From Swiss-Prot:
Designated name of the protein: Glycerol kinase 2
Source organism, top-level taxon: Bacteria
Gene designation per UniProt: glpK2
Origin organism lineage: Bacteria, Bacillati, Bacillota, Bacilli, Lactobacillales
UniProt binding sites for ADP: T13, R17, T267, G310, G411, N415
SUPFAM superfamilies, per database record: Actin-like ATPase domain (SSF53067)
The organism of origin for this protein: Lactiplantibacillus plantarum (strain ATCC BAA-793 / NCIMB 8826 / WCFS1)
């Protein structure tokens, strides 16, 4: 009898990965394909949703070929995805009517600011658990309907569909038969009432978004549909698990109990705490969101979202050409001795939690003639940890906990220097996942549970493995001094945003 596996599609901000896992939760094979981002104007970030679908199709084929696994050996498919990113497409042709507007994009900031000015921020917070920001899908939908000719009328006639990336991929995989999302992705749209678990008609009316274009919201672990036989060599495979990337990582880290916290270092960095079955609205600009919904039960989460983390290392590599690869940043940081006076504030698309400041832009402070490439790279790495501490401290205040342990995953978590500095500056024990692909693993677990590949959460716990542990070892006065410098750097960057500079003006 042939071995059986679970396939996970991990659709990220810069690349797509498809990973095959065995019953022990171990990665058997993976395939990855990058796709471009588009920047039509400063602060705007877009994708071509068709390019995303092509990347997914390519990695599915490649991983099966590379692993020499037949499609009929795949028991189920799980999907995890960059959240908030918004696609609107023609229901008949299946073609997007505009580029996908990415979660990082600030092109809808004026819409969000107008909602706040109109006094809608409190209502949106109470109903959705979110702050009113361009980060979420709601204003992105409104922008597309406003800027594509005839889109509003077509949406009202039921000719257009909206989806976050999970919805788009399920639609494509099922040949246009299934238009669904899950609780976690719905909770990131700024249109979903996290208390009654329905699309919020008050907010839909406020933004004049037709309900007809919205997907059905389902649990995180159930069979949503099956793949079309022409996609996987004749096999019809159940698609049975879906979760936004950060919730999938929380699930993959086995953070099933209230108070458990994980931090994922991806393109951005995202600290998420399991709140249990009772939502708790933040008093300090964190997000209340849905962690997962299983078997009729909903677990909520508190989240701090940092817009720039791993993308800062991409900037060092591609924009500044200070490193040739992300791993090189670790060795360079080790070469920088006692030069902690340099601070990089990587607010390339504004500041996320707990500031929620869309106008501040990136800045560097503390440069001297003696500053080296290694110092600059180290300061950029430190900015990831400083931002994470901002969120950790805020989360402690909101949830009234001590948080002795932080579970970490994601690409930048491979950096030992960064993980030690994170432990030091936050004064918490860091436990790194044995396999940093916990996002995909979480999606695989959700899919496997739905089809009986794994029986329950206890079975998942029995196969869970952890990796390296990093204990804090920095003296308290040094920790306080470094963090005070970071806070001053953030304030200085925020002050600079008020300086009237025309970025489009020419000096010629």
């Amino acid at each position: 009898m042939s071995a059986k596996y679970i396939m996970a599609i991990d659709e990220g901000t810069t690349s797509t990965r498809t990973i095959i896992f065995n019953h022990a939760g171990q990665k058997v094979a993976d395939a990855q394909k990058e796709f471009p981002q588009y920047f039509p104007q400063p602060g705007w970030v877009e994708h071509d949703a068709t390019e995303i679908w092509n990347a997914v199709s390519s990695t599915i084929a490649n991983v099966l070929i590379d692993a020499n696994i037949k499609p009929n050996q795949i028991e189920a498919i799980g999907i995890t995805n960059q959240r908030e990113t918004t696609v609107v497409w023609d229901k008949q042709t299946g073609l997007p009517i505009y580029n996908a507007i990415v979660w990082q994009s600030r092109q809808t900031a004026p819409l969000a600011e107008q909602l706040i000015a109109d006094g809608m921020g409190d209502l949106i917070h109470r109903h959705t658990g979110l702050v009113t920001d361009a980060y979420f899908s709601a204003t992105k939908i409104r922008w597309i309907l406003d800027h594509v000719d005839g889109a509003q009328k077509r949406a009202e006639r039921g000719e257009l569909l909206f989806g976050t990336i999970d919805t788009w991929l399920v639609w494509k995989l099922t040949g246009g038969e299934t238009h669904v999302t899950d609780y976690t992705n719905a909770s990131r749209t700024m249109l979903f009432n996290i208390h009654d678990l329905q699309w919020d008609q008050t907010i839909l009316n406020l933004l004049n978004i037709p309900a007809a274009m919205l997907p059905e919201v389902r649990s995180n672990s159930e069979i949503y549909g099956t793949t079309k036989d022409y996609l996987l060599y004749g096999s019809q495979i159940p698609i049975s698990g879906m979760a936004g990337d950060q919730q999938a990582a929380l699930f993959g880290q086995m953070a099933f109990e209230p108070g458990m916290v994980k931090n994922t270092y991806g393109t951005g960095a995202f600290t998420v705490m399991n709140l249990g079955e009772q939502p708790q609205l933040s008093d300090h600009n964190l997000l209340t969101t849905i962690a997962y919904g299983l078997d009729g039960n909903i677990n909520y989460a508190l989240e701090g979202s940092i817009f720039v983390a791993g993308s800062a290392l991409q900037w060092l590599r591609d924009g500044m050409q200070l490193i040739e690869s992300a791993p090189e940043s670790e060795s360079l940081a080790q070469q920088s001795h006692n030069h902690n006076e340099v601070y990089v504030v990587p607010a390339f698309t504004g500041l996320g939690a707990p500031y929620w400041d869309s106008e501040t832009r990136g800045a560097v402070f503390g440069l001297t003639r003696g500053t080296t490439r290694a110092d600059f790279v180290k300061a950029t790495l430190q900015s990831l940890a400083y931002q994470s501490r901002d969120v950790i401290d805020t989360m402690k205040n909101d949830a009234n906990i001590t948080m002795p342990t932080l579970m970490v995953d994601g690409g930048a978590a491979r950096n030992n220097w960064l993980m030690q500095f994170q432990a030091d500056i936050s004064n918490v024990k860091i436990i790194r996942a044995a396999d940093l692909e916990t996002t995909a693993l979480g999606a695989a677990f959700l899919a496997g549970l739905a089809v009986g590949y794994w029986q329950d959460l206890d079975e998942l716990k029995s196969i869970h493995q952890t990796g390296n542990v990093f204990q804090p070892r920095m003296a308290a006065p040094q920790r306080a001094n470094l963090y005070q410098g970071w806070q001053a750097a953030v304030k200085a960057a925020q002050l600079f945003k008020h300086t009237p500079i025309d970025a489009q003006s020419s000096t010629n």
